[in-house]
């Protein structure tokens, strides 16, 4: 899974390498963070750290981005069904939305054996305003 993902990212990177307004991070970091205006966006495959640990990991791994942003999101991808949890005010963290996204992949033998069947296949995208956080969601069901 990691090798296939890296090879896909590297292929896309090679195709768009001369485009000045497209950037890529194809490092092997398990969690990646990006800022866009007042947004801090984290991403991970979702098979590593627990969902509840993501806000503090974000704050510790990207402290300068954390300090400069107002809206914070972590998008996880490993789960093949829809789950959403909102982390608001708390003792150790506040204001981070952590969300598992649907998968466009079908059920293979492992998913079938473990009962992960029947989930809707989908790709999800988000539009973030530089000033107002996430302002739209797009979902394409297969």
Q: What residue ranges belong to the model's regions?
A:
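Catalytic phosphate/metal-binding cores of nucleic-acid and nucleotide-processing enzymes, i.e., regions
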Residues: 33
């Amino acid at each position: 899974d990691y090798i296939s993902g890296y090879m896909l990212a590297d292929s896309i990177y090679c195709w768009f390498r001369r485009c000045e307004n497209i950037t890529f991070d194809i490092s092997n970091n398990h969690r990646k963070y990006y800022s866009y205006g007042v947004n801090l966006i984290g991403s991970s495959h979702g098979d590593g750290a627990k969902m509840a640990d993501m806000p503090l990991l974000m704050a510790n791994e990207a402290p300068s981005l954390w300090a400069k942003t107002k809206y914070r999101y972590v998008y996880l991808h490993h789960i093949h069904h829809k789950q959403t949890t909102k982390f608001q005010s708390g003792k150790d963290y506040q204001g981070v939305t952590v969300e598992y996204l649907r998968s466009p992949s079908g059920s293979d033998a492992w998913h079938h054996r473990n009962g992960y069947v029947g989930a809707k296949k989908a790709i999800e995208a988000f539009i973030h305003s530089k000033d107002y956080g996430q302002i739209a969601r797009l979902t394409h069901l297969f």
